[in-house]
UniProtKB/Swiss-Prot annotation:
The chain crosses the membrane at residues 30-47, 119-134, 143-157, 198-219, 275-289. Cyanobacteria usually contain more than 2 copies of the psbA gene. Chlorophyll a ChlzD1 binds at residue 119. The record marks 191 as: Stabilizes free radical intermediate. PSII is composed of 1 copy each of membrane proteins PsbA, PsbB, PsbC, PsbD, PsbE, PsbF, PsbH, PsbI, PsbJ, PsbK, PsbL, PsbM, PsbT, PsbX, PsbY, Psb30/Ycf12, peripheral proteins PsbO, CyanoQ (PsbQ), PsbU, PsbV and a large number of cofactors. It forms dimeric complexes. Photosystem II (PSII) is a light-driven water:plastoquinone oxidoreductase that uses light energy to abstract electrons from H(2)O, generating O(2) and a proton gradient subsequently used for ATP formation. It consists of a core antenna complex that captures photons, and an electron transfer chain that converts photonic excitation into a charge separation. The D1/D2 (PsbA/PsbD) reaction center heterodimer binds P680, the primary electron donor of PSII as well as several subsequent electron acceptors. One of its GO terms (cellular component) is photosystem II. It is an enzyme of class 1 (oxidoreductase). It comes from Prochlorococcus marinus (strain MIT 9301). Fe cation binds at residues 216, 273. PANTHER family: PHOTOSYSTEM II D2 PROTEIN, PHOTOSYSTEM II PROTEIN D1. Keywords: Calcium, Chlorophyll, Chromophore, Electron transport, Herbicide resistance, Iron, Magnesium, Manganese, Membrane, Metal-binding, Oxidoreductase, Photosynthesis, Photosystem II, Thylakoid, Transmembrane, Transmembrane helix, Transport. This is Photosystem II protein D1. [CaMn4O5] cluster binds at residues 171, 190, 333-334, 343, 345.
Amino acid sequence: MTTIQQQRSSLLKGWPQFCEWVTSTNNRIYVGWFGVLMIPCLLTAAACFIVAFIAAPPVDIDGIREPVAGSFLYGNNIISGAVVPSSNAIGLHFYPIWEAATVDEWLYNGGPYQLVIFHFLIGISAYMGRQWELSYRLGMRPWICVAYSAPVSAAFAVFLVYPFGQGSFSDGMPLGISGTFNFMFVFQAEHNILMHPFHMAGVAGMFGGSLFSAMHGSLVTSSLIRETTETESQNYGYKFGQEEETYNIVAAHGYFGRLIFQYASFNNSRSLHFFLAVFPVVCVWLTSMGICTMAFNLNGFNFNQSVVDANGKIVPTWGDVLNRANLGMEVMHERNAHNFPLDLAAAESTTVALSAPAIG
């Protein structure tokens, strides 16, 4: 018994030092307990992504024995290349490498895609937890990780929730530039996302957030308190950790209040920066919620054939033009996987005139 206890104590001898190192805020880069999970997951995802982007063989994404190539070695470039989603034949099944009969089968069915996205999602979730952990150690408020939850929610929406709703990981977003655009086009064709209010909020958040960031940065830069001569860089007028303000918020407030109107300008630096954080974050949250609802086919608004004249005849509108564009994109994607999309097979088509008749 004494021998066993001595062996256990020798094995755990370095444990307190390891715990101290992991949770120390004096390290150049904070590790943290979430970092212990984050680091191997993100490294695994990055390594598999790079190898698959360079050398993965074609993947039977639609499950119809028509493999789609996405790697450099099979003719793609940085724009057209992607890690192709796992096969529709796999569906929502968890498909680790040991579930396949051979490595060739695993590659053919798109196994690397699942490996990358699962490790990536765990890694970014752990990164968010690590942000909270470091804030806690330093006695800071926890809002950094709350803000980061917006892009995390977006990643979970397109890589996990949407495939769950559609019934197959083959419907997830490909890991590449043109693959992302293809995902966007197909999403518009099948769900009319551009007409979804939550997506509109996300667009407002991205463009509005960029506008507010540019406005804030330019106002601050334009109202710096002079500390240098004309021949020196104005950046030398600031010393890291100085107590006094480096710009005149009263001047910035006065300028913007006169440029627009008084109450359009913040007179409180804290409320200003809270707004700069909360506006894009809430809008991206809404977009993620929109993706999650459309995953289960609660789609954007459509105004197809919504205007009729006194005789009941349909008056074509831009809503019908948009619907025609959606149908065009829908018939072009996965063109060999089905003969007719459900939208086209369900009812009689309605002619929409897009050109004026000849006169004379």
